[in-house]
Amino acid sequence: MSWQAYVDDHLMCEIEGHHLTSAAIIGHDGTVWAQSAAFPAFKPEEMANIMKDFDEPGFLAPTGLFLGPTKYMVIQGEPGAVIRGKKGSGGVTVKKTGQALVIGIYDEPMTPGQCNMVIEKLGDYLIEQGM
């Protein structure tokens, strides 16, 4: 299965009638493996900062998580494994696997829990596959 198929079929799928706003699978080095059409253009340092937060949990808390033009307030996650951010009625979930970051962005009516479920399920699968 191609990386794009993982994004299209597993991340952008319908969940209780709702979809993520956008999603991507990005290598630890910031290289885009696959992304949905609406995934924001981001700066290399934004991915570097996300990776640093996985290595040093709490690194992003004072400044926020930036992804393209949007700043998310970092909320409870799982140190070294999951970063969650919130902005208004939407947010972002980032799951780290052995080689990639699985990222989902959502807005109402999708809930944070639905986004977490989709992103973490694929992330856990990729970890099981050695990815």
Curated annotation (Swiss-Prot):
Which gene produces this protein?
PRO1
Q: Per the record's keyword annotation, is NADP included, yes or no?
A: no
Alphabetical keyword list? Actin-binding, Allergen, Cytoplasm, Cytoskeleton
Family statement drawn from the similarity comment of this UniProt entry: Belongs to the profilin family.
Q: What is its main location?
A: cytoplasm
Name this protein carries in UniProt:
Profilin
Organism of origin is: Cynodon dactylon (Bermuda grass)
Q: Some GO term, biological process aspect, for this entry: which one?
A: nuclear migration
Cytoplasm is among the record's keywords: yes
| UniProt subcellular location | Cytoplasm, Cytoskeleton
Record-level GO cellular component terms:
cell cortex; cytoskeleton
Q: Which GO terms describe its molecular function?
A: actin monomer binding; proline-rich region binding
Q: How does it assemble?
A: Occurs in many kinds of cells as a complex with monomeric actin in a 1:1 ratio.
